[in-house]
Amino acid sequence: MRIGLFDSGIGGFTVLKKVIKLCPNNSFIYLADTARLPYGIKTTNEIKKIAEEISSWFRYQKIDAFLVACNTTNAIALDILKKNLDIPVFDLIGSAASTIQESRVGVLATPSTVKTKAYTNAILEFKPKTFVIEQPCPAFVPMIEMDNINSDDITDVATGYLQPLLKQKIHSLILGCSHYPLIAPSLRKVLPSSVKLIDPAEALSFKLKLFIDSKTSNYSKNKNFVDLKFYVTSNLKHFPNKAKHWLNVFPEVNLVSLQKKGWVS
């Protein structure tokens, strides 16, 4: 099966890694819109325009399913992606919300995602009596993309972001941006051990597996097989090294422009 997914940068690697583990023997096309990183501080209209361009590009790739590996686009433009692609679309926010069991939930997300209250609304739809508090984290994505992950700086920033949530005595914490699982160790240093970390990619991966299983009866016996194609809109030189670091693959990466019709296939 041919599966597409995208993010503004390397955050979607956290989704791709879990999906590959649970759903091997498929082809994956990963698009990183690095030219417009980060998405989390963009306006609603900007994100909607990006969603139009991304869905148009993926239609050209003839994929069978699509994973929204960017929470900001998920929160603002999921309807656009679903309408334009006309194939099964799997999203992080809805997937995570449907699994929540705790009564007091914190969410770390980008400013644009928090502004929509997408996580709050999705969780309350499944569990109306849940207390949800969302915290915008504008500094995280730039720090992660600059590989500033294991420093005291990011722990200090995390401490500041988490304090309002800890004061509300949350039971679980949703990592509401696909970049954030990359700094889970730093977050865990600040969080009490009783607080459960929730990566939405886990629920999304499970839903994708159910879909693939329902459509595919014959799997290759080679469980290590995976076909990966990577595309970026800028920073072509550095992206293979990032893929090697986080995914343990050193792929060929193609440069594309989402504003032009002369796409690389």
Curated annotation (Swiss-Prot):
Protein's pathway: Cell wall biogenesis; peptidoglycan biosynthesis
Residues at the catalytic site: 70, 177
The entry's keywords: Cell shape, Cell wall biogenesis/degradation, Isomerase, Peptidoglycan synthesis
GO biological process terms on file: cell wall organization; peptidoglycan biosynthetic process; regulation of cell shape
Gene3D superfamilies: 3.40.50.1860
InterPro entries hit by this protein: Asp/Glu/hydantoin_racemase, Asp/Glu_race, Glu_race
Protein name from the UniProt record: Glutamate racemase
Species: Prochlorococcus marinus (strain NATL2A)
